[in-house]
């Protein structure tokens, strides 16, 4: 007999969990660069839209169509007979579908800004088809871990640890983003472009987590269930709040100022950690779980950034993998019935540890195979040029996710806002053509028809003030002796200002500049470009910009000479 209160409660919770996709999309987009925003949004849309039919096809059956120790059963399109108590099968199916999508979307953040969109679609399908359903069966479908007494109420392991382990493996196999590490291995900051979007995403996720955890009772019938739902929601909120405070304090002590993005990461860490045991711990246990989660999150980000050298743009590994692990083990410590700190001994803690180790092994083996197949076939990572230009334009044909907004300096040279500048190679002889092009951008006006081409060109070079002398000497060596030099605006953050982002030093992106202009006819333009590029290159985005224009006519005012004759004593 179905119960309307239980059905309504579960459906509303499912709707809230679905809305977590919006939170993940905003959080990830805000913590990455503007040139990849469209790609981030597409990934968060498509992992849900691909995962939904995949889970309907076989995932749900693998998870719930039977009580085998390792796997449920094969039930394509959910055609079998199921008993979910007071819930119709389709209510339970939609609730589980949105949980499956959450596991898949976690991976997006750690592999952001350098993953092929086609590859992302493929491994999102694999997660929903087989990886998540099998480990989910072990935990929630009557599998061997459930039979041992493993407890994961709403998914610290089943959802977040699965997604977090996959995220860690994927980020490691991809390698870091260009410019993330200097030649000596020091981590560099690559700031996100919109902390407002990130903050809104975290608030949405926090709000939806009440459905994620509270809705996992899948019932609102009876006094005991209602009391449990209230405790679950209270514990969820308390752990998140204290995790945020703990993260803030650690940041303040370690960096001298409270880091915005890491503090918000701390909130998510607390939410992930309390998810496993929110129904079996008291508020005091929830408080400790949250505090540890916030501290763990900060040190975990530092570890993966500086020691493991795994580039995780949004902190997904620290939030979901490490705190999914901590939250699951915390059940064995703080469960009021059987927890180590409540007189229960080590038995429950041992079962919890066995569970996370087993799930980690399953995910690592299967996802290593899947990532390797993708890498050997369609490829896992985009090219250097695509990464430097941004995935929006190359993967989606999107010039900008912010149409109508552009930021230029006084020389009309485009600036990448909050852009890490280090390309990782300061020797131009060893740098790839893509890195050279990113450091010294060249823009040439389309050539004129032969009958209109005077053979003369104006070359305008935007150069950092410190590089002007070396540029002048290099141009003199190839015969350029006449030039116009103009100082232009472009002063910004200077070295030594102490600015940090997620604990890493932020590069100065704007420095004093000069504009050097020369008009040439007998010296080939290509030679000017090559000489200037070699003189300016230091291995950083923004080393210089070169603009080449066609010149229709030149007149020397003093003598009246025109065109080629007017240039003879100035080249």
Give the residues covered by each predicted segment.
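Positively charged, small/polar-rich N-terminal and surface patches that mediate targeting and assembly
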Residues: 394-400, 414-571
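Glycine- and aromatic-enriched membrane alpha-helices
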Residues: 1-447
């Amino acid at each position: 007999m179905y119960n309307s209160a239980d059905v309504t409660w579960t459906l509303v919770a499912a709707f809230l969990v679905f809305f977590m996709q919006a939170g993940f999309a905003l959080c990830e987009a805000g913590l990455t660069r503007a040139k990849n925003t469209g790609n981030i949004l597409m990934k968060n849309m498509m992992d849900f839209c691909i995962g939904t039919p995949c889970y309907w096809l076989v995932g749900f059956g693998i998870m719930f169509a039977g009580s085998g120790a390792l796997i449920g059963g094969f039930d394509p399109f959910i055609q079998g007979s199921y008993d979910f108590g007071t819930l119709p099968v389709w209510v339970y199916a939609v609730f589980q579908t949105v949980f499956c999508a959450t596991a898949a979307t976690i991976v997006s953040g750690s592999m952001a800004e350098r993953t092929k969109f086609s590859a992302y679609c493929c491994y999102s399908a694999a997660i929903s088809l087989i990886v998540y359903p099998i480990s989910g069966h072990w935990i929630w479908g009557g599998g061997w871990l459930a039979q041992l007494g493993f407890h994961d109420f709403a998914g610290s392991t089943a959802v977040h640890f699965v997604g977090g382990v996959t995220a860690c493996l994927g980020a490691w196999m991809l390698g870091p983003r260009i410019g993330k590490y200097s030649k000596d291995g020091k981590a560099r900051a690559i700031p996100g472009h919109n902390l407002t979007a990130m903050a809104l995403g975290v608030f949405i996720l926090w709000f939806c987590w009440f459905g994620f955890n509270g809705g996992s009772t899948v019932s609102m019938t009876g006094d005991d269930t209602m009391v449990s739902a209230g405790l679950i929601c209270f514990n969820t909120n308390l752990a998140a709040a204290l995790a945020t405070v703990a993260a803030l304090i650690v940041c303040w002590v370690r960096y001298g100022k409270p880091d915005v993005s890491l503090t918000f990461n701390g909130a998510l860490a607390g939410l992930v950690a309390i998810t496993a045991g929110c129904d079996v711990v008291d508020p005091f246990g929830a408080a400790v779980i949250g505090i540890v989660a916030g501290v763990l999150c900060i040190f975990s980000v530092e570890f993966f950034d500086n020691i493991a050298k795994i580039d995780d743009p949004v902190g997904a590994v620290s939030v979901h993998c490490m705190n999914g692990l901590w939250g699951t083990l915390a059940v064995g410590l703080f469960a009021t019935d059987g927890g180590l700190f409540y007189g229960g001994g080590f038995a429950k803690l041992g079962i919890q540890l066995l569970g996370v180790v087993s799930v980690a092994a399953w995910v690592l083996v299967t996802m290593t195979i899947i990532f390797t197949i993708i890498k050997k076939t369609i490829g896992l990572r985009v090219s250097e040029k695509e990464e430097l230009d941004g995935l929006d334009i190359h993967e989606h044909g999107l010039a900008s996710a912010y149409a109508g907004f552009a930021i230029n300096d006084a020389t009309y040279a485009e600036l990448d806002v909050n852009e890490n500048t280090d390309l990782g190679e300061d020797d131009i002889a060893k740098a790839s053509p893509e890195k050279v092009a990113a450091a010294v951008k060249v823009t040439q006006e389309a050539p004129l028809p032969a009958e209109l081409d005077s053979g003369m060109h104006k070359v305008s070079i935007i150069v950092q003030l410190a590089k002007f002398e070396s540029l002048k000497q290099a141009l003199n060596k190839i015969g350029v002796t006449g030039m116009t030099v103009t100082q232009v605006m472009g002063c910004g953050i200077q070295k030594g200002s102490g600015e940090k982002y997620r604990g890493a030093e932020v590069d100065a992106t704007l420095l004093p500049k000069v504009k050097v202009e020369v008009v040439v006819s007998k010296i080939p333009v290509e030679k000017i470009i090559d000489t200037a590029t070699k003189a300016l290159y230091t291995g950083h985005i923004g080393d210089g910009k070169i603009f080449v224009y066609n010149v229709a006519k030149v007149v020397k005012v003093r003598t009246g000479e025109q065109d080629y004759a007017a240039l003879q004593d100035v080249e």
